[in-house]
Every structure is written in structure tokens, then in C-alpha cells.
Amino acid sequence: MIAVIDVSGNNLTSLTNALIRLGGHFALTHDAEEIQKASHVILPGVGTARSGMTALQQNGLIDVLRTLTQPLLGICLGMQLLLEYSEEDDIPCLGLIPGVAELLKAERNHPVPHMGWNNLHWQKTSSLQQGLNNSDYVYFVHSYALKADDYALARCQYHEEFTAVVKKGNFYGMQFHPEKSADVGMVLLNNFLSLESTC
């Protein structure tokens, strides 16, 4: 079973529809026991870092997520919450992946938020990349990002380079929305769900 963490009342229709298309058995949940028993966990996120961390804390999920051994995927804000810190609201995050979510620099031809299609540049071989090309496009909507570093599986260029896909151990993050990224996004989600689980 796939646990989709639902603590903020966000509209998760696009994500759940994608999982239905993939034939995944999932539950929208904020129940700690259900999350711990899941084969895969997805942490979506829309809003601010403070609201996201507050929602996780109010539902008693911070320590739960920190101790998971199965694959965990953070999407958009969910990826940023996996980091050590966010400049948005100056708030500590889960600390599962080293790094800080920093505000993107706005330029004349690169407004913030970064919104729309942009391509991935894979840096490391990963099972997430199976069936994909180095020039595939995915859909972004964000103002904060992790600078490209050693944990980046894929990077993206938007005036400056940032991490688009990140991995440390069983923790994965995608700064873009795979559920809104057409066929490429479906391949990425399917590849994540195909990762071996310890549960």
C-alpha cells in the first residue's frame, strides 16, 4: 500500500488520479501506523514551509517520517521539507537530506515563481531515470529550491542551476510535479513505486 500523506487539506486530485492510472493501491492518510506499514510513502506539498512543518508536527508525523526505512518521495514543497532548513519563513525542516531551500533569484527573463515546463539534466545513474532521456521536460511551480549538490540525481537550469531530483538513502525528492508532467511524470512515479521496499 502507498501512503499519500494528507495533512494540509490540499487538492491532491492530480496525484491520486496519476496513482489510479498506475494501478497503485494507495490511501490518503495522516495516521502514523498506516504510514509506517506502507510500502512507499509520498509527501506532497502546496503552501509554505511553515504551514507544512506545522501540519506535520500537529499530526505527530515528524519523528515518524525521520525513522522510515521504506522509499519516501517528497514532491515540490514536500521535497523542500525533507531538507535541513528553508529560507522561506526561516524554519528548520525534517533534516533527512542535507541542504537549504533558498529563494530563486528573479531576473528579467526568469521571473519567480518558476512556473512551467523545463528539462531535466541527469547527473547520476538512477533507477528513477529508467525509460527517460536527458532532455525530458517536467512541470515546475516553485519559488524556493535546493542548490545543485552531490545529492542531486538531476538538475535544472533556470537562470541558475538547482536540484530537480534528489536522493539520500531511501529519501527522494522531486522539485517539480510528476503528476502534472504528462508521460514523463508517469514514468517517474512508476519508477519510484517500483523501488524495493523494506516493509
From Swiss-Prot:
One cellular-component annotation, GO: cytoplasm
Pathway noted in the entry: Amino-acid biosynthesis; L-histidine biosynthesis; L-histidine from 5-phospho-alpha-D-ribose 1-diphosphate: step 5/9
Keyword Transmembrane helix: no
EC numbers on record: 4.3.2.10, 3.5.1.2
Subcellular location: Cytoplasm
Active site residues per record: 76 (nucleophile), 177, 179
Alphabetized GO MF terms: glutaminase activity; imidazoleglycerol-phosphate synthase activity; lyase activity
Pfam families listed in its UniProt record: GATase
The keyword Cytoplasm is assigned to this record: yes
Catalytically driven reaction(s): 5-[(5-phospho-1-deoxy-D-ribulos-1-ylimino)methylamino]-1-(5-phospho-beta-D-ribosyl)imidazole-4-carboxamide + L-glutamine = D-erythro-1-(imidazol-4-yl)glycerol 3-phosphate + 5-amino-1-(5-phospho-beta-D-ribosyl)imidazole-4-carboxamide + L-glutamate + H(+); L-glutamine + H2O = L-glutamate + NH4(+)
Domain of life: Bacteria
Domain Glutamine amidotransferase type-1 positions: 1-199
InterPro entries: Class_I_gatase-like, GATASE, Imidazole-glycPsynth_HisH
Gene Ontology biological process terms in this record: L-histidine biosynthetic process
Keyword entries, A-Z: Amino-acid biosynthesis, Cytoplasm, Glutamine amidotransferase, Histidine biosynthesis, Hydrolase, Lyase
PANTHER family: IMIDAZOLE GLYCEROL PHOSPHATE SYNTHASE SUBUNIT HISH
Subunit structure: Heterodimer of HisH and HisF.
Function: IGPS catalyzes the conversion of PRFAR and glutamine to IGP, AICAR and glutamate. The HisH subunit provides the glutamine amidotransferase activity that produces the ammonia necessary to HisF for the synthesis of IGP and AICAR.
HAMAP family: HisH
NCBIfam families: IMP_synth_hisH (TIGR01855)
Name this protein carries in UniProt: Imidazole glycerol phosphate synthase subunit HisH 2
Gene: hisH2
